[in-house]
């Protein structure tokens, strides 16, 4: 994610609408503006991925745009570019690039502005599939980046499977790992709640059927002494109240789901 959600890339015409030619030429000489390609300029603080997208003639799209806005996405390192249906990409650059292009039509206030959040989510669904869509959707809802109108917009443009995921989504999950676990356990018929406040333990990541606690540690390091001690205290407090706890890190949930699932199912068979 970029430090600033602004794009700071403009066509020369857009720049000239608010500044004189002399002012702009001075900014270019000072390095405050740099030429990306003919007629397109970026601020020296512009997001590197957005600059690369603009060099192709488009904007950030799909998961790249979502990540730029702070929306949780599954690991996908490819650059996604929104070229719109009416854009002409730069063929000399595009042929040599492994970027993923999105050609869906849509309006934006500025030439290189991001797609709307509903459109970003729709691109993710069509490009990356249901799980990637679901974790991004719940993250966008958690961040307040999409409301009822936006959800309705996406619903009208997805198939039955997409609409089902929208209906199942909520705004409670604090990370994509929580969303992913909840989605993958859906078929078991358990009640899986995210961000559950628990006496003496603060807020828990997930709780299954009001008994089994699931903690999903993200990429941040939880191995230092203070984190380890805090986790042990939380687990002991939960056990004191008759609850079991399972902990999984990012790599386990993403790359070893079979083990995670078997552990959860095995523990649930021991439920009192």
Feature-to-residue mapping (PLM):
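Short gly/ser-rich loop at a beta-strand->alpha-helix junction or flexible surface loop bordering the NTP-binding
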Residues: 1-158, 269-272
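Surface segments flanking catalytic/ligand-binding clefts of nucleic-acid enzymes
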Residues: 141-272
């Amino acid at each position: 994610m970029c430090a600033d959600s602004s794009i700071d890339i403009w066509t020369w015409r857009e720049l000239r609408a608010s500044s004189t030619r002399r002012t702009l030429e001075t900014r270019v000489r000072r390095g405050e503006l740099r030429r990306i390609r003919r007629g397109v300029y970026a601020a020296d603080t512009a997001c590197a991925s957005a600059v690369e997208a603009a060099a192709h003639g488009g904007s950030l799209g799909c998961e790249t745009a979502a990540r730029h806005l702070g929306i949780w996405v599954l690991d996908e390192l490819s650059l996604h570019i929104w070229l719109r249906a009416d854009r002409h990409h730069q063929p000399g650059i595009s042929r040599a690039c492994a970027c993923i292009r999105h050609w869906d039509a849509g309006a934006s206030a500025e030439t290189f502005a991001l797609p709307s959040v509903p459109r970003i989510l729709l691109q993710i669904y069509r490009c990356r599939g249901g799980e990637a869509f679901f974790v991004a959707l719940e993250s966008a809802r958690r961040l307040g980046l999409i409301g009822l109108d936006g959800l309705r917009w996406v619903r009208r443009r997805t198939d039955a499977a997409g609409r089902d995921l929208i209906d199942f989504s909520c705004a409670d999950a604090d990370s994509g790992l929580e969303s992913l676990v909840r989605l993958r356990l859906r078929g078991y018929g358990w009640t899986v709640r995210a961000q559950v406040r628990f006496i003496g333990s603060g807020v828990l990541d997930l709780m299954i059927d009001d008994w089994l606690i699931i903690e999903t540690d993200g990429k941040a390091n939880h191995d230092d002494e203070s984190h380890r001690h805090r986790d042990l205290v939380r687990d002991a407090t939960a056990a004191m109240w008759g609850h079991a706890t399972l902990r999984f890190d990012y790599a386990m949930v993403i790359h070893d789901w079979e083990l995670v699932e078997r552990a959860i199912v095995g523990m649930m068979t021991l439920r009192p």
